[in-house]
Regions:
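Short, solvent-exposed coil/turn segments at beta-strand boundaries
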Residues: 25-29, 79-82, 109-116
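Short, cysteine-centered beta-strand-loop-beta hairpins and adjacent loop/turn segments enriched
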Residues: 63-66, 92-102
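Short hydrophobic/aromatic-rich beta-strand segments that constitute the beta-sheet cores
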Residues: 35-37, 87, 118-119
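Hydrophobic/aromatic beta-strand elements that line small-molecule binding cavities or substrate pockets
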Residues: 71-76, 90-92, 104-110, 120
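A solvent-exposed, acidic/Ser-Thr-rich amphipathic alpha-helical stretch
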Residues: 23, 30-78
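Low-complexity, intrinsically disordered terminal/linker segments enriched in charged
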Residues: 118-147
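Short, low-complexity N-terminal intrinsically disordered segments enriched in polar/charged residues
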Residues: 1-31, 136-147
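A short hydrophobic beta-strand element
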Residues: 81-91
């Protein structure tokens, strides 16, 4: 029963995150939570704390305005004092050059008493790096490109 409740809450949370309500994810985090987004890319990081998580979501939103994150599957194991959640995500966005970006990610979350203590995300970094390059190039003015 507990795992069903956690899965339902996780799905509900991701529906809201998918609608750009990123602060809800931050609200679900314990104060000293660790967040890791794997990869040597602009969004790659390993940080601690809710302020750092909030800053990462701001960076994501600035780099990919209108990004859509959709939970496709979730698996829950454990008990309230030590819960593990594995999720499969689908990511879509329209890039600055008007091409479509699509990717998949896996999220591995540890929770204690319904608060995230560890959040580890891995996305196809080759596709993400290419999309980051498109977004960054579009932010460079023509004067800077030629100068």
């Amino acid at each position: 029963m507990y795992r069903t409740i956690v899965a339902m809450r996780f799905r509900a949370l991701w529906r809201r995150i998918g609608a750009d309500e990123f602060d809800l994810a931050v609200a679900q985090a314990a104060p000293g939570m660790r967040f890791t987004f794997v990869g040597d890319i602009p969004l790659g990081t390993s940080v601690t704390g809710t302020d750092a998580l909030r800053a990462w979501f701001r960076q994501l939103d600035e780099l990919f305005p209108g990004i859509h994150l959709e939970l496709q599957d979730v698996i829950v194991k454990g008990w309230p004092w030590n819960t593990t959640v594995a999720a499969r995500l689908h990511i879509t966005a329209e890039l600055q050059d008007e091409t479509a970006y699509q990717n998949h990610a896996v999220q591995w979350v540890r929770m204690r008493w319904f608060k995230m203590t560890d959040d580890w995300v891995i996305e196809d970094t080759v596709a993400l790096a290419a999309a980051c390059s498109v977004q960054s190039a579009a932010r460079i003015s023509p004067e800077r490109k030629t100068g």
